[in-house]
Amino acid sequence: MSLKFTNTLSKKKEDFISINPNQVKIYCCGVTVYDLCHLGHARSYLNWDVLRRFLIWKGFEVKFVQNFTDIDDKIINRANKEGCSTDELSERNIDEFHKDMDTLSILRPTSMPRATKCLHQIINFIEELEQKKVAYSSNGDVYFSVNKHKNYGKLSGREIENQIDNAAGRLKTNQKESKKNSLDFALWKKSNSGEVSYSSPWGNGRPGWHIECSAMVKQELGESIDIHLGGSDLIFPHHENEIAQSEACNGKELAKYWLHNGMVNVGGEKMSKSLGNFTTIRSLLEEGISPMTLRFFVLQTNYRKPLDFTQEALKAASKGWERLNNCLSFGYIYKIKDQAKNEIILDKPIKKSANTNLDKESFKLLSDFERYMDDDLNTSGALSILFELSQPIRKIINFLKEKDINEVDQDELNQVFYKWELLSELAAVLGLKVNLNHENPKNNPELDTNKIEELIKKRSLAKANKDFLLADKIRDDFKNIGIDLIDKPKGVTEWKQLSD
């Protein structure tokens, strides 16, 4: 089966054929750096991390560019509120972004351009649009003339006439005076008095949101790319406007394939900062949710579908990851492999290995894994293959609870180790990284008693508040690090370290 993606542009699943053989150019819309990232951001970037890892595994050379929007209204307002400069705010949140993404084992992009560092390219891009008569200046602003682009609406499927009526009702008084058409969008915005601004041929101001991405794509990857990525909330107007201005400027298709991930929902509503129903990545990690549990949770659902966030779903994902991690730990605990194989434990993308020692059943599972992933990144199907591969490993693990490894038939043991190597390779394609300390308390003998007592108090408070999901989660977390909790009368809880 050939690699297929659901292309938002064509509204159907298509065979993937890169512009240049064995090379893939990808652009992913990044964050506006005015605050910490939430689970919705994690969902998006985890999905695209797996896409990138899978393409590398299949032998493609991948150039992956993701931007930072480091100047816009939200950043200006937040900086004013905090009493700092927009540069200070952006720099701090870029650092925090990297911390979150590194913790989640998301590969860093090949390049991460920032809007404020690409002003020359942005201004040149706007000037080209003016020369082509598809942009016009008005009172210090510059707008893209939507009527001049005949294919406007081809990505979102929206009819331009309906959008004009809708946009007209939302215009401010000054916009009505400046725009020729209510749907025209800003390429350059005149700055208000006292606001951060940059010099340009049209006066002091700052770039519009959409033009940033078009200029950065052209600067980093060229006029046409293979894949453009983003959340489904960006299809209109952001990606629609990107297409319009890029194709008007360059006379070429901006991207062959447009992939969009579904939203994370909380109680039936999209998780977003504007609604105030968001949960930051940082807060989830501080609550004790492991990075790999978050990755596992996200990969259980196809990237295009909505993802419902509940504590119950997180708890189920934690148990699923724990089972898988037990099997991934097996080879490192019972057999020290060579250094090349040990690299699987690291956050490195890997290429498909020869797998010459696999039996017929394992070859079929390898083929099934690739078939699932080729089918529009069916990560839930791919995870099912990992669990099938885990079965003989789990059987050996259970056997070794009572017996010594030397009592296992050597040929059988060798086949199990070959399956473990394949399991480790395929898990790495999904970015699932084995956590040895998590499953083996002997690797982490020094226990922080103050932290233990603090968590026991937190669990007692959760029980008192009838938050039994949290109480059970804390108990499970203790078990995972080799600690057993014993509840006594009068609300007293004692703990002991489990024997190896």
Curated annotation (Swiss-Prot):
Species name: Prochlorococcus marinus (strain NATL1A)
Sequence positions that bind Zn(2+): 29, 213, 238, 242
Gene name linked to the record: cysS
Subunit comment: Monomer.
Keyword annotations: Aminoacyl-tRNA synthetase, ATP-binding, Cytoplasm, Ligase, Metal-binding, Nucleotide-binding, Protein biosynthesis, Zinc
PANTHER family noted in UniProt: CYSTEINE--TRNA LIGASE, CYTOPLASMIC, CYSTEINYL-TRNA SYNTHETASE
Name of a matching Pfam family: tRNA-synt_1e
Location relative to the cell: Cytoplasm
Catalytic activity reported: tRNA(Cys) + L-cysteine + ATP = L-cysteinyl-tRNA(Cys) + AMP + diphosphate
Gene3D superfamilies, sorted: Cysteine-tRNA ligase, C-terminal anti-codon recognition domain, HUPs
EC numbers, comma separated: 6.1.1.16
GO CC entries: cytosol
Protein name stated in the entry: Cysteine--tRNA ligase
